């Protein structure tokens, strides 16, 4: 059963228990746009404890936000008590009219604030933008995200209020900023999104991010491509903004920062070299090398076909250090005292094998290292 159908099942269950309940927000928006629905939110007049009494298995209550998560086959479904006394009051408080939509169990759309018309116009609008943005300043960045992901245009009142209130973005938690910025970067219309942030001045109010005008110009030239990978999105960002230092203050996972740093190093290598050397391909890895060629192609730079890279990778004598025919134990047999020299020797052996200066055979490698030591 799809999460969309599971949502309707939950709505029917709440209705049968005597409570108003509706699928709301992005799920309804995406349904009307003909997009796949990936997650479902439900608004109800029932309190969290009443919801938990109805859905007894595996529920998780967030009392602060009056939300209950119930398990589903395709992921959890979020059920939230009305913000206000009625559905209309709840929808009024939502960020944009295109998200202020609800659907009954019979698929009747409830649209008190013109969200369907705005969907048709491809317009991003807030009901009382001044209030909506002051309630949650992150909505200014969310506006840019929807411009990128949906290809919509912000209405002039939203632009005006973002310009007025942009300084409030500094109060937003950086974790929330990262989520929205990543979704923006993954969208097709990044140029329009960054143009909105530039016009309003909001780009210079994002906490943890310092972007120069020239870097912003680079971001606005990102290719019109949709990326599923967060690693790819942040690598594109790093290339445009001068490297990992531009992301140092952002709470990204350590592994992601490491992958971005490795990707940036590989990109800079290809900026100065027409081909991948065997050694650079080895230390970068095939996945990163292929990603760099995709990035170059997207920027209309000369690029190497994936098949050619895969063939070069396949011809490498080893694909990882663990493939090396010797270990530190083999080195100790040749030289009794352990020490830093072992790491250096293994690295030299690894490079010699990859670059085909030495076959990947124990005796040959030990002989190579002996000659190297004698030549020092």
Curated annotation (Swiss-Prot):
Which cofactors is this protein said to need? Answer: Mg(2+)
Any S-S bridges, and between which cysteines?
Answer: none
Q: Which GO terms describe its molecular function?
A: CC tRNA cytidylyltransferase activity; metal ion binding; nucleotide binding; tRNA binding
Positions of CTP binding? 26-29, 94-95, 99, 136-145, 176
Reactions listed under catalytic activity? a tRNA precursor + 2 CTP = a tRNA with a 3' CC end + 2 diphosphate
Name any Gene Ontology BP term: tRNA processing
Q: Where does the chain bind Mg(2+)?
A: 39, 41
Q: What is its EC number?
A: 2.7.7.-
- The main enzyme category here is transferase
Keywords of this entry? Magnesium, Metal-binding, Nucleotide-binding, Nucleotidyltransferase, RNA-binding, Transferase, tRNA processing, tRNA-binding
Instruction: Say if the entry is tagged with keyword Cytoplasm.
Output: no
Keyword Cell inner membrane carried by entry: no
Q: Name the Pfam families on file.
A: PolyA_pol (PF01743), PolyA_pol_RNAbd (PF12627), tRNA_NucTran2_2 (PF13735)
Q: Which residues form the signal peptide?
A: none
Annotated InterPro entries: Bact_CCA-adding_enz_type3_sf, CCA-adding_enz_C, NT_sf, PolA_pol_head_dom, PolyA_RNA-bd
Q: Member of which family?
A: Belongs to the tRNA nucleotidyltransferase/poly(A) polymerase family.
What role does this protein play?
tRNA nucleotidyltransferase involved in the synthesis of the tRNA CCA terminus. Adds the two cytidine residues to tRNA.
* Name of the protein in its database record: CC-adding tRNA nucleotidyltransferase
Q: Which organism is it from?
A: Shouchella clausii (strain KSM-K16) (Alkalihalobacillus clausii)
